[in-house]
Design a protein with these regions (language model features):
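Glycine-rich Rossmann-fold phosphate-binding loop(s) that bind the pyrophosphate
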Residues: 48-50, 147
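A conserved short coil-to-beta-strand element within the FAD-binding core of flavoproteins
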Residues: 168-182
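Glycine-rich FAD pyrophosphate-binding loop
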Residues: 60-82
Length: 566
């Protein structure tokens, strides 16, 4: 680990005049500039942000020697704020499989309670700790943590795994592709070179060079909404809850967000007037005056970082262009309400990693990658619709919508039934892949929570442990009462396909490959009937439930590994 990386870890955060202290990684001349023999890499990832690093870590864990190219030499955005801070349970489950969850949990702030105010009146609240959508997982509903920390932990984990070559100060300038490979032209401080890969994943963000050169249409619009981020430390700490104001009296009746992050820093987002100048709203004296209006003139704070931001919403027409696939902000951009942007990119990577490995291993047809486009583009469009409704609630674009919004707020002040209509952001949740070509029964396409069980093969304690051990194989989970001859038939099937079979029992039994699930939570999550086999994908999505019959299961696997065409 570089010395400046260690120093930055110890310093944590510094004052406003220097912003956040981030690690710096050196440029190392790649083999292509050292005169080594030319090689074709299995995968090249363009962009070392949250999505690119998640995918790189996933591939490293699966033993794929990929290359990651990033045009910067650090994590986060130099000179920028905390950026994305709110990591949802599904993302935390992914990080658990990748081996970085414990660091994130130790550094971040867990929360489950949210409150929304209109003026001084609380008009909506929730506690996700008691929600059935969250209460089965070993991971909490949400953890707040500055984005650069998460990226930092991923870089460390990638280095620890040792399969992926992360190349800093490497800017991709051009892309060309043939029937069997993609060639990237890369500019570095040491010169330019060409890099060839079987597959390229573009995670380079909304200013992607690749998608422009490949001519992939993008649809969207820039919002007029303007905000100012203020990352501050309080000497006296408020509760670790998500508080939002629709009409904050201390912000000229505009919206405000308040979240706690790591290192005792709070993230305050203030909605600004559309005609305010960016430089003016971010001046320290203006920010301090704004904070004094909210917390009182004697508030004792330290400004860590301040900056304005605007946002846009857009989505590519397709997420695959030949051998180039798009993920994260290169594929879709959405407003920040509900923490759906960064979490969506993490889940893009989770969806894509195992599919790439199956294709590279020859166990699946390349058409399997078309399912990434189908599933994740539908998820992006759902997220855009959801965040779009929040945007319209917070900033009604027409007089009629403002009347409706004001009526909802007035009703919510007095009547509980109206509180569910208050919309300051529907929080990130895993998408359901209703129309996925990989679904093999009506139960398919649903995310399964990371439940714990009493005992399992190999010492696995959770479902994430189990899929991690299975690598890119599909899990076939059946009742422990299955007849021995049928079990042996499934084992023979597992020798022909990427499949791992496991039995589920409520009570201890003397059989191999048995999960002891006394509470029945795993069976509940899988909706597993007696005589059924649940097929669980490596990304903890249910492909479906089929009869415990090797012909039916093999047909389902062929359908999955052909991208729905089998």
């Amino acid at each position: 680990m570089p010395e400046d990386h260690v120093t930055a870890t110890r310093l944590g955060l510094v004052a406003t005049d220097r912003g956040y202290e981030l690690p710096v990684y050196p440029f190392v001349a790649p083999p292509e500039l050292r005169g080594d023999a030319k090689r074709r890499y299995p995968v090249a990832i363009v962009g070392g942000g949250l999505t690119g690093l998640t995918l790189a870590c996933d591939l490293a864990l699966r033993g794929i020697p990929a290359v990651l190219l990033d045009d910067d030499n650090s994590v986060g955005v130099r000179g920028a704020a905390s950026r994305g801070i709110c990591y949802a349970q599904k993302s935390l489950e992914i990080f658990a499989r990748l081996g970085v969850y414990e660091r994130i949990a130790a550094k971040g702030v867990q929360w489950s309670v949210g409150r929304t105010f209109a003026g001084d009146d609380e008009v909506y609240s929730f506690d996700l700790q008691h929600s059935r959508a969250h209460d089965r997982s070993c991971q909490p509903a949400f953890i707040n943590l500055q984005q650069f920390y998460v990226e930092w932990f991923l870089v460390d984990r990638i280095a620890e795994l040792g399969e992926v070559d992360v190349r800093w100060h490497s800017r991709v300038e051009r892309v060309e592709q043939s029937a069997d490979a993609v060639t990237l032209q890369v500019a570095t401080p040491g010169g330019r070179y060409a890099l060839e890969a079987q597959w390229v994943i573009d995670c380079s963000g909304c200013h992607s060079v690749l998608r422009a050169q490949l001519g992939v249409p993008v649809h969207g619009n820039r919002m007029l909404d303007r905000w100012c981020i203020s990352d501050v430390r309080f000497r006296t700490t408020p509760p670790a809850e998500r508080w939002t104001w629709i009409e904050a009296p201390f912000n000229d009746n505009r919206a405000v967000w308040q979240h706690r992050m790591a290192d005792g820093v709070w993230r305050l987002d203030y909605q600004m007037a559309a005609d305010e100048e960016s430089e003016a709203i971010a001046r320290p004296e203006v920010v301090r005056e704004r904070l004094a209006r909210q917390f009182g003139a004697d508030v004792d704070i330290e400004l860590v970082w301040v900056g304005p931001y605007a946002y846009k919403s857009e989505c590519l027409e397709r997420f695959r262009a030949g051998r180039v696939l798009f993920a994260g902000d290169a594929a879709h951009v959405m407003s920040p309400f509900g923490a759906r942007g960064g979490n969506s990119g993490i889940q893009d990577a989770d969806n894509l990693g195992w599919k790439l490995v199956l294709v590279l291993d020859g166990a699946a047809d390349p058409t399997l990658l078309d399912s990434y486009d189908v599933e994740r583009r539908a998820a992006a469009q759902d997220n855009l619709r959801i965040t779009g409704r929040t945007t319209r609630f917070l900033s009604p674009p027409t007089a009629a919508e403002r009347v409706m919004r004001d009526a909802v707020i007035a009703l919510a002040r007095e009547h509980g039934f109206a509180r569910g209509f208050v919309n300051t952001g529907r929080l990130s949740a895993p998408s359901t892949y209703r129309d996925s070509p990989l679904n093999v029964s009506p139960e398919g396409g649903r995310a399964v929570q990371n439940v714990a069980f009493d005992a399992a093969p190999g010492g696995a304690a959770t479902l994430v442990d189990l899929v991690a051990e299975a690598d890119h194989a599909v899990l076939c989970l059946v009742d422990a009462t299955i007849a021995d001859e049928r079990w042996q038939s499934l084992q023979r099937l597992a020798q022909r396909h990427p499949l791992r079979c496991v039995r589920i029992a409520r009570d201890p039994v003397e059989r191999e490959a048995v999960i002891l699930d006394r509470a029945g939570r795993l069976r509940e999550q899988l909706q597993l009937p007696v005589g059924g086999a649940a097929l669980l994908r490596p990304d903890l999505y249910l492909a479906g439930v089929v009869p415990v019959d090797d012909t039916a299961i093999e047909a389902a696997l062929c359908r999955m590994f052909s991208g729905g065409r089998g």
